[in-house]
Amino acid sequence: MADNSQYYDDVDKFAGNVNNTAVDAIVKYCGIALRSKDASLVSCSDPVELGRVRDGFASKKLGLAGDAADKAIAAVCEKMKDDRQKSRVTFYYLLAEESGTMSALA
């Protein structure tokens, strides 16, 4: 298994008691995309990017739809606003935590 400690550390900056199994599941879900700097980050200022997060991970993996997904995404953007480079893994973890759908990951 790959060393995901960098992701655990980043998630730990925003969430207490990190569920490493959930982080591992997100890393596996994202797969090879995490190798690309651009694809490994989420831009909260780009509505197209947030739409992809909503229609992809939030909908397909977490089962969120419509307003519930949009509210959770907005809450995560607010929580991470001081971090200029928002890690996709951390963003997805916080999205699951915010929406109460962590069980879909671990």
Where are these regions (language model features)?
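Core of compact, soluble alpha-helical bundle domains
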Residues: 2-63
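Residue-level detector of well-ordered alpha-helical segments, enriched
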Residues: 22, 26, 49, 68, ...
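Short, compact, well-ordered microdomains
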Residues: 71-106
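Short amphipathic alpha-helical segments and their helix-coil junctions
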Residues: 4-13, 65-82
